[in-house]
């Protein structure tokens, strides 16, 4: 299956997909598909959204359009991509085509966005809510009335945070260890360099995952950890440890520049500021402040508390202030 933009010349293929599953259209409009639905899907976008921000993507197997995704980039804000719909051809439903199309969408979006957002109409929730939950989306709690001609229902918003990394980063060989992360352009002090997202697991689950490295993780709470995706592995996961890093934490998932970073500088964080108590690692970072060993108990060190102030993940900061 491959994903690409649907062109106006392919409106007939899009219309055939829409008409293959009339129940979908009926659940969200109250009417069966109309002859111009495909053309409308290609054209419609929220008022004020520029034309280039809307993309209608097709997931294809050969010449067959298997699924369609309506995507709004930078809506409702510049850090969000909004999924208007994901509809699967009737003949391909129940075969994993929707999940496969969604995975292709995440690859297409890359690391440009902080979160994905979508709306589920209650009249379609039985079919849609479970699917989106399995893809990692969670309800935001925002609920609004929904009206389409005679159909009256309710819309519930769902979101999924995604790992975002500064565009001025690249992976290459590191003098610290293996591959590292390097700046390709200047990054100013206080500028956000990455926001992490992934799957939340318990300590017991994490121990099992760590038996099959690499596993990129940070601690969220005493028994809750965030495991980053590994296929593909996000760019920020290649960031090495330093005992005098140029990044530090400003909340549970966000890293910002500790000082001005020049092109060519290696991007680092202090693993001791974001790990659980079981963690232990020999350090060869080369910094004049290298402590030789990094552990999950480093939050107790007075010199680190003074150096980083409040720039620890919340789970460790709570212990420091406890």
PLM features: what roles do these ranges have?
Residues 109-121:
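Conserved GNAT acetyl-CoA-binding A-motif
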Residues 89-91, 95, 123-124:
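Active-site acidic-Proline motif in GNAT/NAT acetyltransferases
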Residues 164-247:
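Catalytic cores of histone-lysine modification enzymes
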Residues 118-129, 146-151:
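Conserved beta-strand-loop-alpha-helix junction that forms the acyl-donor binding cleft
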């Amino acid at each position: 299956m491959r994903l690409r933009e649907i062109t106006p010349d392919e409106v007939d293929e899009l219309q055939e997909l829409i008409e293959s599953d009339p129940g979908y259209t009926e659940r969200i409009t109250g009417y069966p598909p109309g002859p111009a639905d495909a053309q409308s899907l290609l054209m419609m976008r929220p008022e004020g959204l520029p034309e280039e921000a809307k993309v209608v993507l097709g997931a294809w197997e050969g010449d067959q359009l298997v699924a369609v995704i309506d995507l709004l980039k930078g809506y409702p804000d510049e850090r969000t991509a909004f999924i208007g719909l994901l509809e699967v051809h009737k003949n391909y439903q129940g075969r994993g085509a929707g999940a496969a199309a969604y995975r292709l969408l995440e690859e297409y979006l890359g690391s440009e966005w902080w979160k994905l957002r979508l709306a589920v109409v209650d009249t379609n929730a039985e079919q849609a809510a479970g699917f989106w939950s399995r893809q990692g989306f969670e309800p935001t709690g925002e609920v609004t009335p929904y009206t389409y001609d005679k159909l009256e229902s309710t819309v519930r918003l769902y979101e999924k945070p995604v790992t975002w990394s500064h565009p001025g980063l690249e992976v290459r060989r590191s003098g610290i260890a293996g591959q590292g992360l390097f700046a390709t352009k200047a990054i100013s002090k206080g500028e956000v360099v990455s926001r992490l997202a992934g799957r939340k697991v318990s300590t017991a689950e994490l121990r099992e995952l760590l038996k099959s490295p690499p596993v990129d993780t940070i601690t969220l709470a005493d028994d809750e950890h965030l495991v980053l995706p590994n296929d593909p592995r996000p760019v920020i996961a290649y960031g090495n440890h330093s005992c005098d890093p140029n990044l530090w934490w400003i909340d549970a998932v966000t890293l910002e520049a500790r000082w001005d970073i020049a092109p060519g500088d290696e991007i680092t964080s202090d693993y001791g500021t974001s790990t659980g108590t079981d963690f232990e690692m020999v350090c060869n970072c080369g910094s004049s402040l290298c402590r030789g060993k990094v552990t999950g108990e480093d939050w107790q060190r007075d010199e680190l508390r003074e150096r980083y102030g409040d720039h620890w993940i919340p789970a460790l900061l709570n212990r420091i202030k406890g």
